Amino acid sequence: VFALTSDPQSPIAKACDGVLDINTGIESVGFVTRGFSATVLNLLLMALLIARGQGKACADEERHYLAELRRLAAAIPAAITRTSRFIDRHSATLRDGERFVAIGYGALVGVAKECETKFTETVRVPSSGFELEAYMHGPYLEANARHIMLFIEDQPDERSRALRDYMTPSVAQAFTLTLNDGEDAHTLALNC
């Protein structure tokens, strides 16, 4: 049993066979964003190491994935700048939100669930994260004019965009958060 932790002296670390220090130090605030990001990065690196060791990834694939991780890390400062500007533009709407709902699909379901956790911890209003299809099978019925919806996508997705367009008249605001560069007034395009 191995533990990924920011505290190699923690009770879980002491009870494990092996410890991987994620090297973030102990975060002094109640919401641990740095730890989440470092944990995801370490899990990706572990998966790559295991795949390489088991012959499921060749040296070229390993180099490709490592280059992609470096590219993403290099894009973080620009993503922070774009996000800050987006929040500034929509600060009144975001401040007035009484409930936040994040929608993701595929690997982005985890991001939607983490959004649920972080918004609940920091904004301290009810927040939920849903898988796109699951949201369409009932939870959408609770939407009202005080809700803010966040549609998270890595690539443009017809179903996500159709649901966003369908929900927009029923909620305070529907935003799209995308890795692409197609920004409009209600889309945060991280371009990475």
What role is predicted for each listed range?
Residues 1-192:
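A SIS-like phosphosugar-recognition module
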